[in-house]
């Protein structure tokens, strides 16, 4: 589900980037340029802490959160 969301957001951003090339901006207006990664994080709302994997023993909800890719669901902890 999360990967589908990331792919969907990536496609959405690609369409926006392509359409922005054809749009004209008002003269003299300086807009901050964002990398695709920054724009994606702003849309999804991810912070630096959420992007880093969790170590063994740390709290988790799904396996993708753990560095080991294993989350013991009933204890809600990353395991080896």
Curated annotation (Swiss-Prot):
Q: Where in the cell is it found?
A: Secreted
- Report the leader peptide range: 1-24
Query: One MF term from GO for this chain?
Result: toxin activity
Q: Please, what other remarks does the record include?
A: Negative results: the recombinant peptide has no effect on Kv1.3/KCNA3, Kv10.1/KCNH1/EAG1, Kv11.1/KCNH2/ERG1, KCa1.1/KCNMA1, and on the drosophila Shaker IR channel.
Q: Which family does it belong to?
A: Belongs to the asilidin-1 family.
Record's comment describing the protein's domains: The presence of a 'disulfide through disulfide knot' structurally defines this protein as a knottin.
Q: What is the protein name given in its UniProt record?
A: U-Asilidin(1)-Dg12
Q: Which organism is it from?
A: Dolopus genitalis (Giant Australian assassin fly)
């Amino acid at each position: 589900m999360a990967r589908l969301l990331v792919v969907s957001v990536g496609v959405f951003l690609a369409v926006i980037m392509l359409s922005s090339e054809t749009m004209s901006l008002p003269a003299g207006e300086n807009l901050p340029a964002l990398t695709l990664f920054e724009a994606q994080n702003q849309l999804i709302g991810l912070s630096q802490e959420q992007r880093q994997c969790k170590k063994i023993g740390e709290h988790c909800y799904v396996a993708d959160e753990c560095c080991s890719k294993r989350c013991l669901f009933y204890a809600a902890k990353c395991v080896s």
